[in-house]
Amino acid sequence: MLVSYNWVKEFFQDFPLTAEELGEAITRTGIEIEGVEELSASLKNVVVGEVLSCERHPDAEKLNKCLVQTDEVEPVQIICGAPNVAAGQKVIVAKVGARLPGGLKIKRAKLRGEVSEGMICSLAELGFESKVVPKAYAEGIYVLPAHVETGVSAITLLGLDDAILDMAITPNRADALSMNGVAHEVGAIIHQKPAQPTEPDVSEKGKADDFISVEVENPAETPYYAIKMVENIEIKESPLWLQTKLMKAGIRPHNNVVDVTNYINLLYGQPLHSFDYDKIGSKKIVVRSAKEQEEITTLDGEKRTLQAGHTVITNGVEPIAIAGVMGGEFSEVTENTTTVALEGAIFSSSSIGKASRELYLRTEASIRYDKGSDAWKVEKALAHGGALIAELSGGTLVGGVVEVDNREKAVNKIETNLTRINRILGTAITLAEIETIFDRLGFVLEVKNDALIIEVPTRRWDITIEADILEEVARIYGYDEIPVTLPATSTTGGLSDSQKARRVMRAYLEGAGLNQALTYSLTSKKDATRLALSDEKTVALSMPMSEEHSHLRTSIVPQLIRSASYNIARKNMDVALYEMGTVFYATEGDNLPIEQEHLAGLITGNWHTVDWQKTPKPVDFFVLKGIIEGLVNKLGIKSELHWKQTEKEELHPGRTASLILEGQEIGYLGALHPAVEANYDLKETYVFEINVAALLDATKEKVVYHPIPRYPEMTRDLALLVDKNTDHATISQVIQEHGGKLLVDIELFDIFEGESLGENKKSLAYTLTFLDSERTLVEEDVQKATNKVIEALQEKLHAIIR
């Protein structure tokens, strides 16, 4: 927000700070000032002149030879190329020796043989941006009102002896999106009460009820709506003081009605809108929800298609404005307008923000409604706006307002105590200082025993909890006044078991060769349900920024697939990613969604880098399976991880398995379906996703120290011919159960399938390792254990020992 330093000073009788000092003081209290611009820093010798005569340059069709009276005794000749210059005008003159923005210095010169002693200026040449220059003067010089005295400083007249503070208003301080709000903030800083804006003293005639009535169909979306009438008006340029205030705030002046609505918006932070009463076509205004695909042409000339849920102002039949966003061209105030219906309203901030984003239409009004506003200042703003329009247009202010009021008045009281304030802020503030701070803020303080009860004015709707009160105390007391103190005793920090486990998981996966990815939690409706661990409903955003980010994810894998596709499109063919993040599932009613932490991974391409020592190895199911099993072992989980063949949409039906831990399904591992791979230009790609809570909650084994064995181990190799559907986990379990206490390790070292083995058969070869920590094993011990294993395999799995 652009804030005029001179306008701020108008609120106070004795202002003690320079513009630079004010900027620094506001920044110290929590509102960032991005810059302070002195408007007159590059201006000098610019005065009001009167064009006594104007004739065409004898040697140039587009130049005019003007005789101009300034503050000098004799008039001077100035050659001017502006198409709108004419005799009798009061204009802005940069005299010889004047300085203008951009480093331009005015010198006496000859133009096509004629002497020019100065320059008649446009507003752009004085430093105003072209977007704020009134359209009537966009292509030429600026013509001043006829009553302006010749020779006076144009810098002072145009308010350029000013500084502009560029305030970065954060969403929590929307109260500062008005000059009145800024004045209260400044008043708290300098410990002065700001003067309240006063409206012109204009008498009223007649009754607004005779002109119009109002109906609001949805009070929740429009808690307050009112119309103030002004008749017999004359549309013309606004006075210079109003135009310069608007231009310095970055707003283009239009006419004395529209400019007043913009001025009131700047002053109070309360948007107003003016309708040409005679164009409304009805004596009744109905505020309702838009119909699906209903259309309106807005003031910018664009035809806009509305959605159900957008609030519109109608004449009972068709929309004449999009509530809180922009008016309709149909009821626009023009030079022929004689009666104005002035709207002041409070709309739901969420609905206005939603409509603004969906229509891609952001205005000064929608910004303020979206961020929230003081619901109890609208009457004051409407009265001030109506009176000012009547004064500037010579119109008649109609008595009363037509309103629908469904607001609920509630006193905002927050309780705290001095001990708590000092403990949390680390200060030693006294009660007297607290009383002074709240007096400076304009808050009402009531002291009851140890309790401090603070009544917050409605202009500070951002303050709702005790923490907000403490922040206000810290701001006004001064952040730089809060002493820096070290804790009296040292507190030993430490990680929780779950934090340690997460670090172990990340370190293990990165050590295994996977790279950590961070993807968006927001996804499209299509991707929201893909490859999820659960069938729970998805969570849709009520106001999404785009269709691609309209839902909260239920699985991390789709985003990893997109990341892999992105990398491969850029010739990074070997991709190995993992992500530990949150997924979301909808709950019944308006309850918050269920949040679960998941671990997901993806590999594609080759697993090892190609060099002269290594042969490239394409990724496969078992690479990722081994990584997951290694992770479970690294976490010290006591129970064994089991794998169960399954089918899952978008995964290969023959290469997908569920992960079973302690009897519960905790995730899946599988190859992407060829059709999915084709959609993303991927080749052999494997993914997994696991519920992290299941890993963290699993029973852990205690770490027990075992000395290095003193006695040698013995090994036996077994080659088994089994049914093709018999998996490694089942075989390992049988071997483990019957191998006895001497069996310490089982290692699969070969799998073979072929026609020579017979139909639906496969061969698996294992190395069994035996060890006794107390004595040297003998052949008989190992053979006895091996025989038991063989018998069990033959009996339970019908295995044939090869």
What function would you assign to each model-found segment?
Residues 112-131, 136-143, 155, 163, ...:
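Mobile "lid/hinge" segments at catalytic clefts and subdomain interfaces of large enzymes
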Residues 1-206, 341, 364, 368, ...:
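Phosphate-backbone binding interfaces of nucleic-acid-interacting proteins
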